């Protein structure tokens, strides 16, 4: 546990030192987030806020994880796979953010380009897992444990791509995705500690350290956004952690807010295409509550509480 706390501190200190520099650099070069037209009108005042903060906490977490695991002689293939998930999806987000900044509009990679890259990273993770004699066993409700490489591969790809996008959808308010991710990684850190999975524990704690530093600059009013470089990386990392702890379904509760955010978008699109009517005032659902008059802080606090409750329920029943 002491080593994981050191990983937390290394990541926190590195991030805390680098964020001010990144903010100053972006402001001096007039680089900042362009707010999408279809979002709430009052978000337009956030236009120009520095972004790509995810690059800092992702790299800091990776450095801390490698340093501590290497020092302890526990730099296993599982740790490398988790880093591939974090860095792989982070690079996709970095490319997306870079295009947004270059063209000065809130568009980046085309949807098909982003999806192809996400599938490519997921496929790479599956191949790495296969080379490590990973147990391709998947528990299915009402069917029990099923050992089928093809089925597990499809599930793993869906899980990685799905949750990387789910966290991305949740990153729409100051501090929201940061707090939710901190809670989720904290839950998995505890599960890894209980199961004595050193590599996963260090990885989760390192990510938490970076997020703790980032929150100092991302709470309302945000001085910097994480961008897709952060949100895609966090989601991919969470999915990978849940899989390599042998608890993939846990993410439905631990990441319940991410699931609800994604479901709200799917339901909204399906309803509008089939009936011409919208279920929510705006999606993802955090914007719906904004449209009802909730402040950003109220949405943050309520959603964080839901995330805590979801994680708490999982830990009480299955932890």
Curated annotation (Swiss-Prot):
Membrane topology: Multi-pass membrane protein
Top-rank EC class of the record's enzyme: transferase
GO biological process entries: cell division; cell wall organization; peptidoglycan biosynthetic process; regulation of cell shape
Catalytic activity: UDP-N-acetyl-alpha-D-muramoyl-L-alanyl-gamma-D-glutamyl-L-lysyl-D-alanyl-D-alanine + di-trans,octa-cis-undecaprenyl phosphate = Mur2Ac(oyl-L-Ala-gamma-D-Glu-L-Lys-D-Ala-D-Ala)-di-trans,octa-cis-undecaprenyl diphosphate + UMP
TM annotation in the entry: 5-25, 51-71, 79-99, 119-139, 149-169, 173-193, 197-217, 224-246, 299-319
Disulphides: none
Cofactors that this protein relies on: Mg(2+)
One function term, GO molecular function aspect: metal ion binding
The entry's keywords: Cell cycle, Cell division, Cell membrane, Cell shape, Cell wall biogenesis/degradation, Magnesium, Membrane, Metal-binding, Peptidoglycan synthesis, Transferase, Transmembrane, Transmembrane helix
GO terms under cellular component: plasma membrane
PROSITE patterns the record matches: MRAY_2
Cellular location(s): Cell membrane
EC number: 2.7.8.13
Iron in keyword set: no
Pathway this chain belongs to: Cell wall biogenesis; peptidoglycan biosynthesis
Family statement: Belongs to the glycosyltransferase 4 family. MraY subfamily.
HAMAP family: MraY (MF_00038)
Purpose: Catalyzes the initial step of the lipid cycle reactions in the biosynthesis of the cell wall peptidoglycan: transfers peptidoglycan precursor phospho-MurNAc-pentapeptide from UDP-MurNAc-pentapeptide onto the lipid carrier undecaprenyl phosphate, yielding undecaprenyl-pyrophosphoryl-MurNAc-pentapeptide, known as lipid I.
Protein name (database record): Phospho-N-acetylmuramoyl-pentapeptide-transferase
Gene name of this polypeptide: mraY
């Amino acid at each position: 546990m002491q080593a994981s706390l050191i990983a937390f501190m290394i990541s926190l200190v590195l991030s805390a030192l680098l964020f001010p520099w990144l903010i100053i650099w972006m402001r001096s070069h007039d680089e900042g987030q362009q707010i999408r037209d279809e979002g709430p009108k009052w978000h337009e005042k956030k236009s120009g806020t520095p972004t790509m903060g995810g690059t800092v906490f992702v790299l800091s977490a990776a450095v801390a994880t490698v340093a501590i695991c290497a020092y302890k002689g526990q730099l296993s293939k599982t740790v490398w796979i988790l880093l591939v998930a974090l860095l792989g999806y982070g690079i996709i987000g970095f490319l997306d953010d870079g295009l947004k900044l270059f063209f000065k509009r809130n568009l980046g990679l085309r949807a098909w380009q982003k999806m192809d890259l996400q599938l490519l990273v997921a496929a790479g993770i599956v191949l790495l897992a296969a080379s490590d004699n990973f147990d391709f066993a998947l528990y299915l409700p009402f069917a029990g444990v099923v050992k089928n490489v093809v089925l597990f591969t499809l599930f793993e790809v869906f899980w990685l791509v799905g949750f990387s996008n789910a966290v991305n959808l949740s990153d729409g308010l100051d501090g929201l995705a940061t707090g939710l991710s901190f809670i989720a990684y904290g839950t998995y850190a505890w599960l890894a500690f209980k199961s004595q999975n050193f590599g996963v524990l260090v990885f989760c704690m390192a990510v938490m350290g970076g997020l703790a530093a980032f929150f100092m600059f991302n709470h309302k009013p945000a001085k910097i956004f994480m961008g897709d470089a952060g949100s895609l990386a966090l989601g991919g990392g969470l999915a990978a952690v849940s899989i390599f702890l042998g608890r993939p379904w846990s993410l439905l509760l631990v990441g319940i807010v991410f699931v609800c955010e994604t479901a709200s978008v799917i339901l909204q699109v399906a309803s509008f295409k089939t009936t011409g009517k919208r279920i929510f005032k705006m999606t993802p659902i955090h914007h719906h509550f904004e449209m009802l008059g909730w402040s950003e802080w109220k949405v943050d606090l309520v959603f964080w509480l839901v995330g805590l409750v979801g994680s708490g329920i999982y830990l009480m029943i299955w932890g």
